[in-house]
Amino acid sequence: MLQPKRTKFRKVHKGRNTGLAHRGSTVSFGSIAIKATERGRMTARQIEAARRAISRRIKRGGKIFIRVFPDKPITEKPLEVRMGNGKGNVEYWVCEIKPGKILYEIEGVNEDLAREAFALAAAKLPFKTTIVTRTVM
């Protein structure tokens, strides 16, 4: 499971996920990519599930680039615990996704196979996505 090796602080404020993704919004490493069209959170488990779906479909054909990393800790209190008494324990890690963010890229496979793999991966994600290709200038 993906998570930071160390962080400056153990717990963070909830915050608000607003705006569009300007960084990480272009296809940089591969030839075809999957891009978020809605905002949301992607847990480390979802990142891994989508990666496995892609790698199972393309087998040993190409290279997968993961462009997201879960760097935000999410805390939860145990069941049947009263309110108050401080913030809960860190349960899992998420990556805040803004519309326009590139999530995964593939290099070295034909476009039809990559589209099939991304369709399988999109089913594992909690927001809408689209498939984009690299534009050559």
From Swiss-Prot:
GO process annotations (BP): translation
InterPro entries linked: Ribosomal_uL16, Ribosomal_uL16_bact-type, Ribosomal_uL16_CS, Ribosomal_uL16_dom, Ribosomal_uL16_sf
Key words of the record: Ribonucleoprotein, Ribosomal protein, RNA-binding, rRNA-binding, tRNA-binding
GO cellular component, one term: cytosolic large ribosomal subunit
GO terms assigned for molecular function: rRNA binding; structural constituent of ribosome; tRNA binding
Self-association state and partner proteins as the record states: Part of the 50S ribosomal subunit.
Function, as annotated: Binds 23S rRNA and is also seen to make contacts with the A and possibly P site tRNAs.
Family: Belongs to the universal ribosomal protein uL16 family.
Protein name, per record: Large ribosomal subunit protein uL16
Organism classification: Bacteria, Pseudomonadati, Pseudomonadota, Gammaproteobacteria, Moraxellales
Name of the gene: rplP
